[in-house]
Amino acid sequence: NPKKRVYVVEGPIDSLFLKNSVAMVGAGALKEIPKRLENTPMSYILDNEPRNRQICSYIEKLIELGGDVCIWPDIIPEKDINDLAYRMSTRRIQKMIDENTFNGLEATLRFREWRKV
């Protein structure tokens, strides 16, 4: 539903656990998804891999573009939504993502604390 916030996740399986979500597949997704969902509020949820240079690069780029990005809290050891679903309800996952989604300066500060690269 493009009238509601769309959750852009890294993989197709992750998209099964969130309402109104779409999987970011392929290198062009960072440019194509915003074009297709113009004027739609979006949150980007990438995998919880603070040592992965590619993920860190994507997050940094999304923040620079003014995107809303989920910065995983330190208490979450799981790598992605799929893994998290084994121990947490989808409602709780959605709430946690909403509470840890930031943009602008706050996103930059949280990202710097989160990344390990």
Label each PLM-derived region with a short phrase.
Residues K3-V6, P12-V117:
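TOPRIM fold recognition
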